[in-house]
Amino acid sequence: MTHCELMQVGDIQAVVGDASRDGVGGTQYCGVWSLTTKRRVFNAFGNSYAGLIPGDIRGKAPRLEVRSDSCCALVRKADDTYPVDVCATYELVAPHYIDHTLRFTDRRDVRGPGCSFREVSWCCYMNCPEDSRINFLVGGKWFSYISPEHGVGSNIAPAYLPDRALEVWPKVEGRRSFHWDRIRERFDQPFYYGLLGDHALMLLFDTPRWLRFFCSPSGGGGSLRARETCPAWDFEWVIPASDYKVGREYALRVRLVYKPFVSQDDVLAEYEKAVAELGFETV
């Protein structure tokens, strides 16, 4: 059985793997095991972790399928332990893109206890960035942010949705999900970026009406830098009750860009390019 696949296109090299590695958190880190470029050979993601990890297959033993020299998928069929059909594709596109799509169909209602909404989340565990913050637009200006501690001020909602359209988290006894703590600031547009050395890692999203960002300063574990931790730059789509249906196939898309940082205007240009090339929905 093949557990991982190395793909190289243009300037970018990626290793996509299943959950077979027994890492710091056990066998759960499926997704992009390694991400480098010809100009930056240091892995963007934590070496015992991964990036673009879909929560719907995390720790659920997905199967790796190689589709071509530049595309592979992580696939899992619904069963009694998790009744969701899932296919996560990772396609490298020259010179510096990973186009990622998650297709899934719930065979039973898998919404959390007390939740009217369906959460579909991803984690990206970053490798020792000097600046742990993600950057996004707030009120037309760039805003840099990382939560002060794990589980505090972790969730960022979109500015283009009214309060009444946002999910209401249920009251729970004991510890609740770490990303259920929202900050006042809201993002204007469905993208963010972070810096890794002289490179920018950008995440550009489709289906913006369901999108949320969330983050942690320590989700990626210990850093190579003394007394520092590695952040998690995460995101999710929240499907409201009015749009949720058992048996319906959903497709959620994100473009990852990994290239030398040029300017914030270049980030905007990459988003506009994704909209034009991939037909992403805009706000």
Label each PLM-derived region with a short phrase.
Residues 1-69:
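Acidic-aromatic substrate-binding/catalytic surfaces of carbohydrate-active enzymes
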Residues 12-14, 20-26, 96-98, 107-112, ...:
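Primarily extracytoplasmic ectodomains and periplasmic/lumenal surface modules that are beta-strand-rich
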Residues 47-98, 104-109, 113-116:
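Extended, loop-rich substrate-binding clefts of extracytoplasmic carbohydrate-active enzymes
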